[in-house]
């Protein structure tokens, strides 16, 4: 579909993340290294500004549910108005439509099995970080 895919890890001041931006970049790079046309980068600012600075014409967003669409539609319209950047929406596989990072972290924090929801190389990193954050409890 695209000659190059850029996964941009953005700093979101309103969200509390479990991993730092460099850690997230490293983990994404680890699981996408089999795809030679995928590049991982980071940005602190608006996604449309990143797109403009890197000559990216299309933002691809995954949609899980109607609630995602409501928010992402507003974002896509403002992104188009601000910088002329189009957004392509792709629906997620039905088997994953209920997933969120919060849900996966909660299940894992109670030693639940999340191996079907995250790439195998990242499972131990998630468990180790949750143990550190929760003091081993």
Q: What kind of region is each of these model predictions?
A:
Residues 1-137:
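Nucleotidyltransferase catalytic core that binds NTPs
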